[in-house]
């Protein structure tokens, strides 16, 4: 079970594995957008500024390839906004408690969830908190390619 509440808009996002995702009791699903250049992508920035380095090339690459970037300020809400189709994708490095509930909601809404860097063999990918990527199924591979290219540049 995953639950995320948005008190500003009185929105309750919830999901149970295998039973779908819901917003205030109504079923939700990711957007049907197929082109990254027409997509809204969300991300966040680290509080520890010494880790900001890789974010800049990624941000630059994503901005060049999508419609726009959003920074809402809550990873859980960013991910839920992907689940309900308000955004097409989200990427960031987080702590697992920041994304666990929202990740289930996004998966149940039809999103693809993974990472844009390699997950160490000794860590379960669903709990790996570095370089998280969540997007609708059409946008996921496009955004993955952009982020991986930015990291290689």
What are these model-derived regions, one by one?
Residues 1-22, 37:
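DPxDG-like acidic metal-binding loop motif
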Residues 29-153:
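An extended, acidic
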């Amino acid at each position: 079970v995953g639950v995320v509440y948005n008190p500003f808009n009185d929105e309750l996002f919830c999901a149970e594995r295998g039973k779908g995702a819901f917003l205030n009791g109504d079923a939700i699903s990711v957007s049907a957008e197929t082109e990254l250049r027409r997509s809204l992508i969300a991300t966040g920035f680290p509080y520890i500024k010494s880790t900001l380095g890789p974010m800049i090339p990624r941000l630059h690459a994503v901005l060049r390839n999508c419609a726009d970037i959003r920074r809402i300020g809550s990873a859980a809400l960013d991910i839920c906004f992907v689940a309900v189709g308000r955004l097409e994708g989200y990427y960031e490095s987080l702590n697992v408690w920041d994304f666990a509930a929202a990740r289930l909601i996004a998966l149940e809404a039809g999103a693809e969830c993974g990472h844009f860097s390699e997950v160490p063999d000794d860590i379960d990918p669903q709990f790996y908190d570095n370089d998280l990527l969540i997007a609708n199924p059409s946008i996921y591979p496009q955004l993955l390619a952009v982020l991986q290219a930015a990291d290689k540049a």
